Design a protein with these regions (language model features):
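RNA/tRNA-interacting regions in translation and RNA-turnover enzymes
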Residues: 1-215
Length: 215
């Protein structure tokens, strides 16, 4: 969650448990595409996702000699990167931020439209998640389009969200114990691939354990 005041990045907080997160403002200032200053001068609060591209993940992991110390996936690497105590390390990880929800922007008329909120954020210099405006007739086509595109996406994505554009109507629906009723989330099916085990090598970890490594 990013908060801006007087056009400057004021605070950045992780999602945490949904109620309490960690303040990571110094680290957020090193994110590749987070604007430190924006045109809007009121208080702006937005939510987004921090990610590391697959290409940067492979490069960073390749520089770690200890096999056991390597990260399993870009999400694990990103999670550790945004919570680093040393902001210089965060900067080296090339973390990107994609906005997916505007929480507050006082005095701005969004014409009761979520899409207008996305357009506003883009004008402030933020990269937003990729989206398509759909109707009941075009929804399945759009889902299929994203499903095909996701295989070559440069950053991790675990699903797709259908969100009502009408802000007032969406908020009037309320929420369940865990989720708002104005949106539906889909998860992509797990990727599957067939592999061949050619041989097994043994590798010593930094703690002295001997571990098998599949080749």
């Amino acid at each position: 969650v990013l908060t801006y005041r007087d056009g400057k990045l004021f605070k950045a907080v992780t999602r945490g448990n949904g109620e309490v997160g960690e303040v990571i403002t110094p680290n957020a200032k090193t994110f590749v595409n987070v604007p430190l200053q924006i045109p809007y001068q009121g208080e702006l609060i937005l939510r987004g996702e921090a990610v590391i591209t697959y290409a940067d993940f492979e490069k960073i992991n390749g520089e770690i000699e200890d096999v056991d110390a390597r990260y399993k996936n870009p999400r694990n690497l990103c999670s550790g990167s945004v919570r680093q105590l040393n902001s210089q390390i965060t900067a080296q990880r090339k973390v990107h931020f994609f906005a997916f929800a505007l929480v507050r922007a006082e005095g701005v008329d969004f014409k009761n439209s979520r899409e207008e909120q996305f357009i506003f954020l883009q004008k402030q210099g933020f990269e937003t998640v990729e989206y398509k405006a759909v109707t009941a007739d075009t929804m399945q086509e759009a889902v299929a389009w994203f499903e095909e595109k996701i295989t070559d996406y440069p950053v991790p994505s675990d699903g797709l969200v259908l969100l009502l554009d009408d802000i007032a109507y969406g908020e009037s629906l309320g929420r369940t114990a865990k989720f708002p009723r104005n949106a539906i989330a889909f998860k992509w099916a797990d990727e599957q691939a067939e592999t061949t085990l050619r041989e097994v090598e043994w590798s010593a970890s930094r703690t002295g354990l001997i571990n098998p490594v599949a080749i």
